[in-house]
A protein has these predicted regions:
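Carbohydrate-interacting regions of secretory-pathway proteins
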Residues: 1-154
Length: 154
């Protein structure tokens, strides 16, 4: 299914050192090799044991390589965390374990400026669609998902 305005809640448990993510508004097709080329990513990570992603805007609950969360109420690897993503008319909220940790607007000047300074600068269609699939990332690390629920917002 394709989603534009929605609320997603998912429980996940990360392995030690693990790295994964949840992408939304993903466009798939022959023009794209990977979902991350078009879909903004809510980062899932073991912050303590994944030193390659130590920058704040690459930590758990960040919009990967764009915005750091305001706080980090995550539970360490091996424990269940609850993620929430809410998208309504380009306004996006990231939730972690019941706490609102990040807000941004997909069309704001700040967002567009950050994109130019990020790894997404060369991906012309990244975060452009406004509608698309929701994708759970396989980054090669063990991560478990349960209680995945999506609700459309009218």
């Amino acid at each position: 299914d394709l989603f534009d305005n929605f609320e997603l809640e998912v429980h996940y448990r990360m392995s030690p050192g693990g790295n994964s993510g949840i992408m939304y508004h993903v466009t798939q097709g022959s023009d794209y090799k990977d979902d991350y080329e078009t879909g903004p990513e809510y980062q899932l990570l073991d912050n303590e044991l994944a030193p390659s992603e130590s920058l704040p805007h690459r930590q758990v609950a960040s919009l990967y390589d764009m915005y750091a969360p305001n706080s980090s109420p995550y539970l360490p690897a091996g424990q269940w965390n609850v993620v929430g993503i809410r998208v309504l008319d380009n306004e996006v909220e990231h939730w972690l374990n019941g706490e609102l940790v990040l807000q941004y607007n997909l069309k704001s000047a700040d967002f567009l400026q950050r994109k130019l300074q990020s790894k997404w600068n060369d991906d012309a269609d990244w975060a452009k669609a406004g509608i698309g699939h929701i994708s759970l990332q396989d980054h090669g690390d063990k991560v478990e998902f349960k209680r995945v629920a999506v609700r459309r917002i009218k």
